[in-house]
Amino acid sequence: MTNIRKTHPLLKIVNNAFIDLPAPSNISSWWNFGSLLGICLVLQILTGLFLAMHYTADTTTAFSSVTHICRDVNYGWIIRYMHANGASMFFICLFMHVGRGLYYGSYTYMETWNIGVILLFATMATAFMGYVLPWGQMSFWGATVITNLLSAIPYIGTNLVEWIWGGFSVDKATLTRFFAFHFIFPFIIAALAMVHLLFLHETGSNNPTGISSDADKIPFHPYYTIKDILGALLLILVLMTLVLFSPDLLGDPDNYTPANPLNTPPHIKPEWYFLFAYAILRSIPNKLGGVLALVLSILVLVLMPLLHTSKQRSMMFRPISQCLFWILVADLLTLTWIGGQPVEHPYIIIGQLASIMYFLLILVLMPMASTIENNLLKW
């Protein structure tokens, strides 16, 4: 008799996705981040659910309710800090996952890649709305500054911003709707992630060489299940080290001051994982131009399959492209640093140069390098 896992309508899906799935025999630890992102999402949904049980989405009590969670709720402090730092781990895994995709040419799986870009946008939107909920100074002013960017849209901008605010400023209506959206979005992300996986399993995983691995497949279980468990343990180790030893390391001290519309903090800045985009936004003196650059900095990922001029899929055997890739990584780190600095000399010019470099590398230099490498292969 056939094993139940191969015949049962539900178990069959799990079996084909996580047990008997044919996987390339040579995928490295860079392929661990997909499962780690899944773990991060489940962790965020669970901790978020328990936080929502004690949180109140009202301007008068939101800040106090978060304090109450940390002081009076059983293990509330650890749930709160796991949720806050879990977001950081989520974005570290996201950036690594996208970086892996860029390096090894995984973007040639167009459907999987484009859903991934939508997932990235959805996760960024969720994290932004979540940051508003504690209703500290940085929550309030971050919400004000970022939502205000939509007013740069010609003709409908102002109406759009007031519609999102639910009034003429960030207030109770804004907080309530942000809480509602912050609660529902992770479930939308989970659904999209399943579609992401569905499309991936249509083609099978890419591998470091970028060459078809159909001739050499191994079952996902036990090989990659055990590998994913190791990755998960390392993720939890890093997360819990952060939570238990320095939970506020990545946060902003300003968010421990209750929101005050009459007092603007000296330096308004988002969480660290948005700083690179924030630096690109600030490097353009024009409001609409800045907003466009901000959106394009992520949307440029959609163009990656079109910008792929190389005859090889992966960068494994392309040293020039490798150099440019790591320069891009360094550039993104520079932008992240600049995003957290005040708007003054020399930071302004460094930010502008790094922003130009970012788009230049992706849109011009990397496709050029690929063409040069193609020609070098003819010799």
UniProtKB/Swiss-Prot annotation:
A ubiquinone binds at H201. The cytochrome bc1 complex contains 11 subunits: 3 respiratory subunits (MT-CYB, CYC1 and UQCRFS1), 2 core proteins (UQCRC1 and UQCRC2) and 6 low-molecular weight proteins (UQCRH/QCR6, UQCRB/QCR7, UQCRQ/QCR8, UQCR10/QCR9, UQCR11/QCR10 and a cleavage product of UQCRFS1). This cytochrome bc1 complex then forms a dimer. This is Cytochrome b. The keyword Transmembrane helix applies. Its cofactor is heme b. Heme b b562 binds at H83, H182. Binds 2 heme b groups non-covalently. It is found in: Mitochondrion inner membrane. Its main location: mitochondrion. Heme 1 (or BL or b562) is low-potential and absorbs at about 562 nm, and heme 2 (or BH or b566) is high-potential and absorbs at about 566 nm. Keywords: Electron transport, Heme, Iron, Membrane, Metal-binding, Mitochondrion, Mitochondrion inner membrane, Respiratory chain, Transmembrane, Transmembrane helix, Transport, Ubiquinone. Belongs to the cytochrome b family. It comes from the Eukaryota. The chain crosses the membrane at residues 33-53, 77-98, 113-133, 178-198, 226-246, 288-308, 320-340, 347-367. PANTHER family: CYTOCHROME B. GO terms for cellular component: mitochondrial inner membrane; respiratory chain complex III. Heme b b566 binds at H97, H196. GO terms for biological process: mitochondrial electron transport, ubiquinol to cytochrome c. Component of the ubiquinol-cytochrome c reductase complex (complex III or cytochrome b-c1 complex) that is part of the mitochondrial respiratory chain. The b-c1 complex mediates electron transfer from ubiquinol to cytochrome c. Contributes to the generation of a proton gradient across the mitochondrial membrane that is then used for ATP synthesis. The gene is MT-CYB. It is a multi-pass membrane protein. It holds the Pfam family Cytochrome_B. GO terms for molecular function: metal ion binding; ubiquinol-cytochrome-c reductase activity.
